[in-house]
Amino acid sequence: MNILKKCLPLVLCFSMICTLFCFQTVAGATAYDETISNGSFADFQQALLNAKEKGTSNHIYKIHITKDLRINQSVGIYSNTMIVVDKNVKIIRNLPAGDGGTTFRIGQPGSSASGYYYKNITIQGGIWDGNVRSKDTGFCTFKVNHSQNVKFLNMTIQNDLEGHMIEAGAVNGLTVSRVNFKNHKCYFKAHKNKNDYYEHEEALQLDVNLYETTAIGNYDKYQNKNVTVDRCNFINLGRGIGSHNSIDGCYFTNMKFTNNTFKNIKSYAIGAINYRNSRIQNNKILNCGSGILFVNSKPNYTGYTGTYVVNNWKLKVNSSKDNSIISGNTITINSPKSKDSRALYINGNKISKPAIYKKGLNSANRLSGYQGYLKGDHRINGLTITKNNITVKNMTAVFYKGIRNSAFTNNNITFNGNQKADYYGLTMDSVPDQLNENVTVSGNKIKNFNSGILCKNSKKITFKNTTVYNSYKQHIYLEGVNVTIVGCSLDKAKTKHGIASKNSKITLKNTNITNAKEFGLYSYNCSGKVTGGKIANCGKYGIGAYKKGISYSKVKFSNNGANGKCNYYRG
């Protein structure tokens, strides 16, 4: 009896634990508000309407799909809704042939929604198939506008036609994680410049609410912000992430593109226009037409359509620091698709008065404005590019224009192509009234290009501890710049000159220049000073200074060819 009394509490306790455990299991199994297991489109539509009526911030209405489902007309998804599709289950677009409508939209066309109106929407799992047929016209799979806290998780979106797989405008808090975007299709039937049109279509478009094709609800100046795209795959597409429109003075903030893979993209993998406080990190970009574009407003780049000014919104140019970073990316481009292709294309500009290229905006949105730029300093300000590995063939790797207060550090850049072709590892080129300014280039390795670095129309530029070798024409070309070169190494016998310069002010410190076929440092109409370092094994002079002199001290000259020990010449 005593033993029974002692055991009874333990038995009761164990029984309570089992009961609780069983309850939790049952509750977990019935967590969905509705399950669509019969493939009925009508049932799915009704479930979405139920979610619209019953879902709240405290109770997200969960719809579970367990069997393939055909979508017969455009579908609206509303706040506080979660759609979960089982693995390998297909959601198949089956709209009437020739219907170019969006398959899934957040909200209702013609609504007055504005700001970040719709909220708490999750799409998870499954294969969302565009099911392109011969008579179909272009469509988007998902369109998200005026929303917040929207998630796309663990799913595949495939077979889109001449549209975007996800198009988002005016979204605060968009998460796209572990999503496979693949197989964009285009018939090229109705377009004069077929390839250019194809390349307009980003799989994930982060757009502005300017046209009826992008806006559900009001046309307003609310921008995308707090967007995360992580661990996604982009395969066989026109473009990866980005947009081909921008509104001057409208900035996207806290945009994070991390750990994604891009393969076989015809145009660029990532296009960032007017971004602030953003990160593009640890992505793999393989066999794409271009790599990463980071620009303020529209550059002169193939495939972009326009930057617009909207008078109604009274926006201003924000010239404060971008505070953005591009780092840890692997970019390999062997088949550039145009003369403008770059692994990294960084572009800003400075506008002294409003630039109007085309008056008027689309009449449907009842906004006044023009295609062009606001007056102001649009140069990229405070961008860090670091620890990227770049390999290219028959193209310039990195292009800088209109950059200030920025850093380019610890990047590896390699060329695999015909060195006689006029391609550069790093081009820092601008125009006299839009100078690159206060830029540090440090700790980089650049090899096998026709010319390693080109720098023009720039001031307060510092090259530090950077190695450039095996260039064909020259390691560094300078024109119209104020530049300091410290602790760099310029080597290998193929190059004509170590440094070639024109109309510049040069400060060269503790830099080694070796094995140039002609001059270690060739300068025309330049001023400056060379201190320390060595200039050795050059075919002609160590320093050849024409029209103006270059002074030097504590430089070790050895084995330079012309006139034996003559290392300095002024013509």
Regions found by a protein language model. Name each.
Residues 18-31:
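Sec-dependent signal peptide cleavage junction
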Residues 1-11:
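Bacterial N-terminal signal peptides that target proteins for export
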